[in-house]
């Protein structure tokens, strides 16, 4: 065990990227069902599509999984509303400041990780 496996309650310290256009429920549930942390890539999904993928994730796995949300997404209010309503437990944020949404997500017992870039190196920081 290490800090990643303990934090997310996963078997292996593997986190799939929340890649736009390809990180849907099938890929994310496959990663989660095999001991990693699968992430839905919300950046390319309209709110209704994201909601559908979240519901399919709930059906496809009982293992931990999360969503990667680019904070520059134009419909963030709707995305956050869906995340709260559908009881998502883990949210990775990127592409913007997490300050506006982190307190609300944490208040609802959601683990929040912000992914940011420094120059060419990508870093992950638990908020």
Predicted region positions:
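Active-site entrance/lid segments in N-terminal catalytic domains of soluble metabolic enzymes
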Residues: 1-126
